[in-house]
């Protein structure tokens, strides 16, 4: 016998969490007035008249810091469930998590030595 009934609450919340934003967008699209004009098409800069082009190209340094942040954020997502069930999993899973962290440390040291984390 499969224990799929345990997931009923999960599927219910998943369906509700998908339906609420869809319904909100549909209702706002139906009820909101549609007015197009030059003011709607201009870029907004905190109430100040826009000066120049609104599109800017960001420097690559911002993307490198964002990439490093995402890597360590994903590391946290993977390590949190392991830490919560550490006493049940045993030593072999501890060694696997240690190898995972060591690979990330080696990667961050490599990025640091290549100069990817320097601002200037």
Curated annotation (Swiss-Prot):
Enzyme class: translocase
Record-linked InterPro entries: NAD(P)H_OxRDtase_bac/plastid (IPR023043), NADH_UbQ/plastoQ_OxRdtase_su3 (IPR000440), NDAH_ubi_oxred_su3_sf (IPR038430)
Keyword Ribonucleoprotein listed: no
Gene Ontology cellular-component annotations: chloroplast thylakoid membrane; NADH dehydrogenase complex
Membrane-spanning parts: 14-34, 64-84, 88-108
Biological processes annotated in GO: photosynthesis, light reaction
Record's bilayer topology term: Multi-pass membrane protein
Disulfide feature: none
Catalytic activity: a plastoquinone + NADH + (n+1) H(+)(in) = a plastoquinol + NAD(+) + n H(+)(out); a plastoquinone + NADPH + (n+1) H(+)(in) = a plastoquinol + NADP(+) + n H(+)(out)
Assembly mode: NDH is composed of at least 16 different subunits, 5 of which are encoded in the nucleus.
Protein family: Belongs to the complex I subunit 3 family.
Protein name: NAD(P)H-quinone oxidoreductase subunit 3, chloroplastic
Organism: Cicer arietinum
Lineage: Eukaryota, Viridiplantae, Streptophyta, Embryophyta, Tracheophyta
């Amino acid at each position: 016998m499969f224990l799929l009934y345990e997931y009923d609450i999960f599927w219910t919340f998943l369906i509700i969490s998908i339906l609420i934003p869809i319904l909100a967008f549909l209702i706002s699209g139906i009820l909101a007035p549609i007015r197009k004009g030059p003011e709607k098409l201009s870029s907004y800069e905190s109430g100040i008249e826009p000066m120049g082009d609104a599109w800017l190209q960001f420097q690559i340094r911002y993307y490198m810091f964002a990439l490093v942040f995402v890597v360590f954020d994903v590391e946290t997502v993977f390590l949190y469930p392991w830490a919560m069930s550490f006493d049940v999993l045993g030593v072999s899973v501890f060694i696997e998590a240690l190898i995972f962290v060591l690979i990330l440390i080696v990667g961050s040291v490599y990025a640091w030595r290549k100069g990817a984390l320097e601002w200037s």
